[in-house]
């Protein structure tokens, strides 16, 4: 469990002009309801929630890890299902599943697509098997536009969750981009594996980061360094609030191995779930008195 985050000055890097909306939140000229171009700026939310969740990327391994931790936290008395949740890549599946109360058995029974896969709409088709056309106002996801390479935060109250997870999980070179409102999006992890700075405004934040930490090898060390910067900036911005970091233990990290393609192994995702559940249950006991619920 750690604390840290990232910041932005609200200026357009191409011309130096201030392109924020006056609140520190950047909006493009073509912003739509439910689609905010943050490009690194901290999220501005009118309502302050007791708790917000952030679920990071990590392939099918990451889905199993995030959902397992979330279910363990819930069993331990942390109200993750009613907290606004931001998901990136694998984390977008977890955020959606937890908010909708989707049983983990339904997730693991989905047929994972072969990787790499160029079939247009493959992720959306699988996601619709799980989520249908459901929307949910507490879910948002991070995705990156193909044309501008800027991060957008997409609101699950405005778009079907199936489309959001397809956009946020479209790993370049492995899975095809997904189109929403005429824009092509790829994996939000191209910007940040977690996007802690875009978490909903809240008194407490819990970050579940499947890729971060020394036990995850070179990828984990790199992801952990970047996440550390995000957490540090978050704490500097929110000195009166609490943030908790949950990342894989050594035993859990062994399921990922050293080959990055292991992250897309469905069997590893299934195997990691019960261990992640137990970790979430333990963490609930540790952080319960620090989390505003």
Predicted regions and their residues:
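Patatin-like phospholipase
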Residues: 1-88, 94-293
């Amino acid at each position: 469990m750690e604390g840290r985050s990232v910041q932005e000055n609200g200026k357009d890097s191409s011309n130096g002009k201030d392109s924020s909306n006056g609140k520190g939140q950047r909006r493009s000229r073509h912003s739509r309801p439910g689609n905010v171009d943050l490009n690194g700026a901290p999220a501005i939310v009118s309502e302050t929630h007791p708790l917000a969740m952030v679920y990071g990327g990590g392939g099918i391994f990451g889905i199993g890890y995030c959902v397992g931790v979330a279910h363990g936290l819930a069993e331990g008395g942390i109200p993750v299902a009613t907290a606004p949740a931001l998901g990136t890549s694998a984390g977008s599946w977890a955020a959606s599943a937890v908010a909708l109360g989707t049983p983990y058995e339904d997730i693991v029974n989905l047929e994972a697509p072969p990787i790499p896969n160029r079939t247009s709409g493959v992720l959306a088709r699988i996601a619709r098997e799980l989520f249908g056309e459901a929307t949910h106002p507490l879910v948002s996801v991070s995705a990156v536009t193909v044309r501008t390479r800027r991060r957008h935060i997409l609101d699950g109250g405005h778009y079907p969750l199936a489309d959001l997870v397809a956009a946020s999980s479209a790993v370049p070179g492995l899975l095809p981009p997904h189109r929403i409102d005429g824009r092509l999006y790829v994996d939000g992890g191209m910007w940040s594996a977690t996007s802690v700075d875009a978490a909903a405004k809240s008194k407490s934040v819990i970050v579940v980061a499947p890729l971060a930490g020394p036990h995850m090898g070179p990828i984990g060390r790199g992801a952990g360094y970047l996440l550390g910067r995000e957490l540090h900036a978050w704490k500097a911005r929110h000195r009166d609030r609490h943030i908790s970091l949950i990342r894989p233990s050594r035993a859990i990290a062994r399921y990922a191995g050293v080959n990055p393609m292991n992250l897309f192994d469905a069997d590893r995702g299934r195997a990691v779930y019960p261990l992640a559940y137990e970790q979430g249950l333990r963490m609930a006991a540790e952080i319960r008195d620090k989390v505003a619920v």
